Each structure stands twice: as C-alpha cells, then as structure tokens.
C-alpha cells in the first residue's frame, strides 16, 4: 500500500462518521450536503456552486450503485464557477443506501420517477425553468429516458460512457478482455473469463470479475492509476469511512445489480429512443470497452434530435471526467455558454447550428 493511500486512510479514519462539505466562500454561493425524500425514500444530495443564479447541472451517476459524490472536488471544481452542481446518491447507493430501498422499488421506471421528482423541486428552489442533465454509464440510461419523458425540464442532455444496447455492449466488453488475455498469453485470465461467458455475467457476480480484468486491460480506465482513485475516495469529506469501504467493496453496486440486473441488461436505446426533442451530446472515451464506443457511434448516427454532437476524449476509456477532468470541465462550460440560456434557449441553439455550418 502506497504512503499516499495510508495517509488518506488515516485521515478517513479520523473523520469517522463526521461528514461535511467545505463552505463555498462566495457571497452568493451554496455548499450543502443534505437528504431529501424522493417518492417515499430518503436520498442524499451534494449541492455546490459559487453563484446560486447560475444554471443547474445535475449529474446522474453510474452503476446502478456507483456514486459520483466522492469525485465532486476532483472533477467539478471549476464547474462550480459556472453552475450550481448537484450530485445525487440514487436509492441504494452511497449515502442513500440506508435504510435500504424496498426491493420492488429497484426498477428503471422508479429511478426515472426519482430523477423527475428531484428536478422539479430543484427548479422551483433556484427559480429556474430547466436543468442541464448529465448521465454517466447507467446514469446515461436515466438521462435519455428523462429527456424522452420530460424534455420541458432540460436545456440539453449529455450521455457520458453512454449505454446503448446493453446486452451487445456486455458481449463486446467480454470479447475485448478475452482477446487481450489471449494476446498476452495470460492463462489465468483466459481460464477465468471462459468460465464466465458473455453478457450473462451481467446478472451474476461474474460481472465484477470481468470488470477487474477490464480495468487491467485499460477498457475501464486508460490513463488513471487505481491508487490515485483510492486516494481521492478516502479524502472525500462528504463520505464517512463506512461509505468509502462500501464503495471499495462494491457493496452498493452488487446490491443494485442483483435486484435490477435482469432489467438493466435488456436496455436497448436504439429501439427505445429513436428521437429526442432536446439537444443531445455524447462524451465518449476512445478506449471505452465498458460501454463500447462503437455502439455510441451507432446511436449517435441513428438518433434524431434538433442538435447532436459527439465529443471524443482521446486519452480516456469509460471515465472521461476522471481521466481528462480539465477537458471534461471545459466542454461543459462551453456547452453552458451556448445552450443554458433561460431567456432564449432556442436562439442559442440556432446560433450554434449556424456557427458550425460556416
């Protein structure tokens, strides 16, 4: 264990159950860590921004069961100047794991309802009409479904590490790691992977075994050391040592996949969402074999939308916000400048389209 991780672990232990979010330090800023009740179940929000009049950016994390709250200070610090950034631990995840959501509530439809139930009071509280919705991996499924159901709530929708045809994506991901194992003559990996099979592993704990090999072969993270990730996690003031341990052991993701795996593996947005009425963006890693980029290209090509754009992160796999945080934030800031206008969102859209046609 590296000295950095040991130091971070010691600091996390000292923190024990005391969690907080650092003050913003600006006259019109906000820094809140608090629970809210969404459709009868308590769920936690982290809200940070230097100016409460800025547009709302809602981040929908992946998994299901994989929080983004612990990454807020690493991946969204600059964004706090331009947005009111909202990180939400969905039911069954992170700080929203307990008291334990009813098993029957762990459905895609319920998560979509939770998302809408979160957006509406946020808009009312901050006196705004629309949010910028960003979904990562599993969160990209929610984002697209919310965009289809309630486009009136959104400036635009962004899919990062976009899930498209989940069963086909899992098969491609499985074949990638198996091919890499054969290429390096890794007998142990070949034996383990051949015992697992393809997309069927998604509904079993075998998914997590496949993901460990995917991390090794760069299809999850291409340009980020796992030790650095652990250090970021352990230094998160919003999370207790218990929250950190749960993330490291993948407790929440295992809980969620065991209850939702059969439904989630069947997601196929190529069939379910052929068109959207809001601007759509895709943030895609050039080495992503978790939600393979070839399927994102296919979805991008087939999707009908008033405006759409595919933005490549050439040095990333499935985690562009972690692997290229500066570019991730620059792209969102530029997007906000063009699309997040309360007064004239359509004028901003037309101006952007004309500029790109020049």
Positions of PLM-derived features:
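The serine-hydrolase catalytic nucleophile loop
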Residues: 64-76
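Glycine-rich "HGGG/HGxG" loop immediately N-terminal to the catalytic nucleophile
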Residues: 69-70, 92-106
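Conserved alpha/beta-hydrolase
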Residues: 80-98
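Conserved acidic catalytic loop of the alpha/beta-hydrolase fold
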Residues: 110-130
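Alpha/beta-hydrolase
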Residues: 179-180, 187-271, 278
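Short beta-strand/loop motif that positions the catalytic acidic residue
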Residues: 276, 282-284, 288
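Catalytic active-site module of serine/aspartate enzymes centered on a nucleophile-bearing elbow/loop
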Residues: 309-358
